[in-house]
A protein has these predicted regions:
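Short Cys/His-rich "knuckle" micro-motifs
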Residues: 154
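The canonical Cys-X-X-Cys-His
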Residues: 139-150
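Processing junctions and N-termini across compartments
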Residues: 15, 137-140
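Extracytoplasmic c-type cytochrome modules immediately beyond a signal peptide or single-pass transmembrane anchor
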Residues: 23-136
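Bacterial N-terminal signal peptides that target proteins for export
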Residues: 1-7
Length: 154
């Protein structure tokens, strides 16, 4: 009985927090932009989990990071669709016009990010800490490189 009450209280709290976060989020006029921005928020959380796994001393920490690694790789695969031409002029984003003006350069950055995140996912699935750490560093470098070229400060 106590567990049921506790579970109900936790669920109610979680719903309240999610509802408040939803209220505080500034939505754009484009659902792709909303999806992109939400995905970036999740990417930050997943990258933090991957970083903790790479620094952990537990033997199975990398293998336990397979789920966030999968999320990062999945988001990377979705990036081209999230930066469609209909999102170019949407206000309230930090996406620079260079994304669309230099489409081949942006595509190359996305391809590097996709390759790096696929390597992180494979290394996590295999439980290979050395490959995981290397591919995570490559993923972080790809993030930074793309943000430097294609994201406004702020």
């Amino acid at each position: 009985m106590r567990r049921t009450i506790l579970a109900a209280a936790v669920a109610t709290l979680a719903i309240g927090v999610a509802a408040q976060a939803h209220e505080n989020h500034k939505h754009s006029t484009n659902p792709l932009v909303d999806a992109r921005q939400g995905g970036m928020t999740m990417l930050v959380a997943n990258m933090a989990a991957l970083t903790r796994a790479s620094q952990a001393e537990e033997a199975d920490a990398v293998a336990k990071a397979a789920f966030p690694a999968s999320g990062v790789a999945s988001f990377a695969r979705s990036l081209p669709a999230l930066f469609g031409p209909e999102t170019k002029d949407v206000a309230g984003t930090r996406a620079l016009p260079a994304i669309w003006d230099d489409a081949p350069g942006f595509a190359a950055q996305v391809a590097e990010f996709q390759a790096a995140t696929a390597a992180v996912q494979a290394a996590a699935k295999a439980g290979d800490k050395a490959a995981f750490t290397e591919s995570l560093a490559r993923t972080k470098a790809a993030c930074q490189s793309c943000h430097t070229a294609f994201r406004a400060e702020g």
